[in-house]
């Protein structure tokens, strides 16, 4: 129950520092607009609850980016000979940043030339260190087995990535972008009300 009640603050920590003047700003992202425009394949790779974040996030990313997004279980990704090269963006999602299957999938994708963008909670984790780029969720420790704030913050950050990239690609209407950014800013308070 404690961690459920911490969700509004966790979402605020994940969202607020990245919203400025009605824009999504990722100060810590090294990806350039040119590199983003060059991706022709996008994978979301994760395990457990993070995989389910990817399944939900896929729909929003496809809507915003007008590109196919494939979601893969990390434990299966490296065994299926995925079509991955230097024009592939692989988004790794992990709460701990230490999940072994996810680490193995990251290494396989990187070996094939993919650009790795990770969404993780634990600063300085193995996945964060081995990624080309990392966005932290800043959800804080999560002790309960049933995920709450980690799931919420991962999904919020993934949605922000989609919105930011869509603006760069020109695949989102200005009105939809502005409305969604406004809704993101209100999300922590809306969660608190429920």
What is each of the regions a protein language model found here?
Residues 1-39, 160-194:
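Cofactor-/ligand-binding subdomain signature composed of acidic, glycine-rich
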Residues 37-186:
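Glycine-rich phosphate-binding loops that contact phosphosugars or nucleotide phosphates
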């Amino acid at each position: 129950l404690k961690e459920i009640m911490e969700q509004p603050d966790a979402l605020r920590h994940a969202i607020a520092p990245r919203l400025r003047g009605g824009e999504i700003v990722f100060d810590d992202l090294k990806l350039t607009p040119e590199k983003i425009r060059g991706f022709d394949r996008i994978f979301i790779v994760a395990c457990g609850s993070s995989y389910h974040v990817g399944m939900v996030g896929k729909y929003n990313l496809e809507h915003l980016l007008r590109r196919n997004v494939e979601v893969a279980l990390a434990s299966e990704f490296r065994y299926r000979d995925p079509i991955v090269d230097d024009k592939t963006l692989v988004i790794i999602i992990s709460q701990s940043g230490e999940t072994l299957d996810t680490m193995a999938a990251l290494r396989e994708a990187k070996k094939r030339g993919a650009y790795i963008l990770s969404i993780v909670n634990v600063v300085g984790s193995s996945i964060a260190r081995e990624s080309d780029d990392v966005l932290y969720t800043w959800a804080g420790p999560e002790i309960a087995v049933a995920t709450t704030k980690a799931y919420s913050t991962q999904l919020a950050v993934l949605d922000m990535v989609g919105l930011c990239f869509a603006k760069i690609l020109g695949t989102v209407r200005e009105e939809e972008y502005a409305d969604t950014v406004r809704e993101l800013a209100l999300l922590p308070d809306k969660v608190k009300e429920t």
